[in-house]
From Swiss-Prot:
PANTHER family: RIBOSOMAL PROTEIN S15, BACTERIAL AND ORGANELLAR, SMALL RIBOSOMAL SUBUNIT PROTEIN US15M. This is Small ribosomal subunit protein uS15. CDD domains: Ribosomal_S15p_S13e. Keywords: Ribonucleoprotein, Ribosomal protein, RNA-binding, rRNA-binding. One of the primary rRNA binding proteins, it binds directly to 16S rRNA where it helps nucleate assembly of the platform of the 30S subunit by binding and bridging several RNA helices of the 16S rRNA.
Amino acid sequence: MSLSTEAKAKILAEFGRGANDTGSTEVQVALLTAQINHLQDHFKEHIHDHHSRRGLLRMVSARRKLLAYLKRTEAARYNELIQKLGLRR
């Protein structure tokens, strides 16, 4: 259920600050968002997959914490990121 290497590379190129930037908050949030969207599609077909749903909730929680950190430290980058990802806040 993880993202393909190509999908991750595309996200890194779009949201990363450099070629090897995998740890910045923006990249982490973008990767989590892609995984969350992938799991949401999975749940449309597999409604009773509660084990994966627990993982989804953990990802949503981690993304929420990262977004709160980014909003607290650098509000301009936060606003730009949620606009790019199409998240509502």
